[in-house]
Amino acid sequence: MAKKTIDQIDVQDKTVLMRVDFNVPLDESLAITDDRRIRMALPSIKSVIDRGGKVILMSHLGRPTGGEGDEKYSLAPAAKRLGELLGSTVHFATDTVGDDASSKASSLAAGEVLVLENLRFNPGEKKGDSEFAGKLAAMADAYCNDAFGTCHRKDASMVAVPEAMAGKPRVVGHLVAKEIQYLTDAISKPERPFVAILGGAKVSDKINVINNLLGICDAVLIGGAMAYTFSLASGGKVGKSLVEKDKVELAKELMAKGGDKLQLPVDTHCGDDFGNIAGCNKKVVAAGEIPDDMEGLDIGPETAKKYAEVIKSAKTIVWNGPMGVFEKPPMDEGTKAVAQAIADGDAVSIIGGGDSAAAVDQLGFADDVSHVSTGGGASLAMLEGQAFAAVDLLDEA
């Protein structure tokens, strides 16, 4: 699956149309609260401008329902922040394929950067529209995909644009190359023991991942609220815990398939008031023994200890989804114990994006793991064994 990278093509005086992921959080005053995604795109952008090329950046931000002009979904703050990080002027177009974008794209000089307005302001983006894609494609001499977070999607900028640029160089950026290498290596040639840790709320979100990983991993450790659906499937009492009753039969099938590989919590940290975790009645009970007026909120200390032992012996670890309500202490203890065990070990550790990436960051372990993925949905899709059309059609290395 190795693809040609941005560093491997000639960009001198050429225009590169680069799909990035600038889907950054903004506060009420439209200030960026976390610019990590912009910073992660810098190596690919610099690869072009430092070699005398021109860059046109395209991205989505949020899920706008109206047309252009809804400033809370505008990429203007991202363009401004990028200029600060690069220490140079970054041009911004108020549309994607309109007059402003066209005139600014055609007047770009070598070493300059243009950010187009939010792709999703145009309905053609989500529809994968070829006419919209053709207008974007016409602006450039080469295409670069550096948006791993949307690699599993078939949006116009991900698939129809590179299709429209057949015959021109179509490559991956640094970020996508790194993501694919880590995740592909983990799945296809892991150093063993290979352990997967899966948390989060819903079994339904992770069915295909659990299924695929049970065939590849030496152990699959389950935490988060989805553990309560497994508990219910084993005949346990789950109280008021979040469960998917329509997925109980499926949980039984996964337990039968997984056997000893599929490890479930042995105890649970529960409480009686989700809205006031600090002040709720908290107690640790055996798994499957949650009182009727309580709900499970985290794995218990025995489970944390048991999982830490498995993690310490691992050589490859994939973690997707927290063990409990990590954003509400003390229900962060299970997630913290897992993060600590990963940080203390010497395994190749890959943290799936989304909540697990936020947890690792919040708990201060981001520098102690091998790789924190930038794409929650995309990393899950790769762990399911899905092929990505957006990557498959790019040039082979």
UniProtKB/Swiss-Prot annotation:
<keyword id="KW-0324">Glycolysis</keyword>
<feature type="binding site">
    <location>
        <position position="120"/>
    </location>
    <ligand>
        <name>substrate</name>
    </ligand>
</feature>
<dbReference type="GO" id="GO:0004618">
    <property type="term" value="F:phosphoglycerate kinase activity"/>
</dbReference>
<feature type="binding site">
    <location>
        <begin position="21"/>
        <end position="23"/>
    </location>
    <ligand>
        <name>substrate</name>
    </ligand>
</feature>
<dbReference type="GO" id="GO:0006096">
    <property type="term" value="P:glycolytic process"/>
</dbReference>
<dbReference type="Pfam" id="PF00162">
    <property type="entry name" value="PGK"/>
</dbReference>
<keyword id="KW-0547">Nucleotide-binding</keyword>
<dbReference type="InterPro" id="IPR015824">
    <property type="entry name" value="Phosphoglycerate_kinase_N"/>
</dbReference>
<feature type="binding site">
    <location>
        <position position="37"/>
    </location>
    <ligand>
        <name>substrate</name>
    </ligand>
</feature>
<comment type="similarity">
    <text>Belongs to the phosphoglycerate kinase family.</text>
</comment>
<dbReference type="InterPro" id="IPR036043">
    <property type="entry name" value="Phosphoglycerate_kinase_sf"/>
</dbReference>
<keyword id="KW-0963">Cytoplasm</keyword>
<feature type="binding site">
    <location>
        <begin position="60"/>
        <end position="63"/>
    </location>
    <ligand>
        <name>substrate</name>
    </ligand>
</feature>
<dbReference type="GO" id="GO:0006094">
    <property type="term" value="P:gluconeogenesis"/>
</dbReference>
<keyword id="KW-0808">Transferase</keyword>
<dbReference type="GO" id="GO:0005524">
    <property type="term" value="F:ATP binding"/>
</dbReference>
<comment type="pathway">
    <text>Carbohydrate degradation; glycolysis; pyruvate from D-glyceraldehyde 3-phosphate: step 2/5.</text>
</comment>
<feature type="binding site">
    <location>
        <position position="327"/>
    </location>
    <ligand>
        <name>ATP</name>
    </ligand>
</feature>
<keyword id="KW-0067">ATP-binding</keyword>
<protein>
    <recommendedName>
        <fullName>Phosphoglycerate kinase</fullName>
        <ecNumber>2.7.2.3</ecNumber>
    </recommendedName>
</protein>
<comment type="subunit">
    <text>Monomer.</text>
</comment>
<feature type="binding site">
    <location>
        <position position="296"/>
    </location>
    <ligand>
        <name>ATP</name>
    </ligand>
</feature>
<dbReference type="GO" id="GO:0005829">
    <property type="term" value="C:cytosol"/>
</dbReference>
<dbReference type="InterPro" id="IPR015911">
    <property type="entry name" value="Phosphoglycerate_kinase_CS"/>
</dbReference>
<dbReference type="InterPro" id="IPR001576">
    <property type="entry name" value="Phosphoglycerate_kinase"/>
</dbReference>
<feature type="binding site">
    <location>
        <position position="153"/>
    </location>
    <ligand>
        <name>substrate</name>
    </ligand>
</feature>
<feature type="binding site">
    <location>
        <begin position="353"/>
        <end position="356"/>
    </location>
    <ligand>
        <name>ATP</name>
    </ligand>
</feature>
<feature type="binding site">
    <location>
        <position position="206"/>
    </location>
    <ligand>
        <name>ATP</name>
    </ligand>
</feature>
<keyword id="KW-0418">Kinase</keyword>
<dbReference type="GO" id="GO:0043531">
    <property type="term" value="F:ADP binding"/>
</dbReference>
